[in-house]
Amino acid sequence: MSIAMTAPTTGVAPMTCETRLPAVPCHVGDPDLWFAENPGDLERAKALCAGCPIRVQCLTAALERQEPWGVWGGEILDRGSIVARKRPRGRPRKDSGGNPAAA
């Protein structure tokens, strides 16, 4: 006589990220938007986060993990800290500012 060992069935589907979380903007849109280089794209990602039901938890967790960069909880993070806005890559444009030597 042999006894087959089987896992008990509960009738409940396994939890996935999609079933645990509501349709949050970062899970239904373009994920690259939250890690864009363009400051305008990052501002758009921040705006999409504004009505997110898990915004506060997202930001708290990102700060605890010291996320290196991206938009988390409606804020831009750079090296684990919140920054007001991301500067574009490259050197800032030189401003002549009325300096005749710069012309």
UniProtKB/Swiss-Prot annotation:
Region (Disordered): 82-103
Subcellular location: Cytoplasm
GO molecular function: 4 iron, 4 sulfur cluster binding; dinitrosyl-iron complex binding; DNA binding; metal ion binding; protein-disulfide reductase [NAD(P)H] activity
Pfam family, one: Whib
Binding site for [4Fe-4S] cluster: C17, C49, C52, C58
GO CC entries: cytoplasm
Entry superkingdom: Bacteria
Ranges where the 4Fe-4S Wbl-type domain occurs: 25-82
Gene induction: By a considerable number of antibiotics many of which perturb respiration, redox balance, or transmembrane ion flux, including erythromycin. Much stronger induction by erythromycin plus the reducing agent DTT but not erythromycin plus the oxidizing agent diamide. Positively regulates its own expression.
PTM note: The Fe-S cluster can be nitrosylated by nitric oxide (NO). Upon Fe-S cluster removal intramolecular disulfide bonds are formed.
Keyword Ligase annotated: no
Key words of the record: 4Fe-4S, Antibiotic resistance, Cytoplasm, Disulfide bond, DNA-binding, Iron, Iron-sulfur, Metal-binding, Transcription, Transcription regulation
Cofactor note: Binds 1 [4Fe-4S] cluster per subunit. Following nitrosylation of the [4Fe-4S] cluster binds 1 [4Fe-8(NO)] cluster per subunit.
Cofactor: [4Fe-4S] cluster
One GO-annotated biological process of the protein: cell redox homeostasis
Phenotype on disruption: Not essential. Cells have a 5-X decrease in mycothiol reduced form (MSH)/ mycothiol oxidized disulfide form (MSSM), an indicator of a more oxidzed cytoplasm.
Recorded family membership: Belongs to the WhiB family.
Its biological purpose: Acts as a transcriptional regulator. Probably redox-responsive. The apo- but not holo-form probably binds DNA. Participates in maintaining a reduced cytoplasmic (MSH/MSSM) environment under normal growth conditions and directly or indirectly controls the concentration of mycothiol (MSH + MSSM).
The protein's name in its UniProt record: Transcriptional regulator WhiB7
Gene of this entry: whiB7
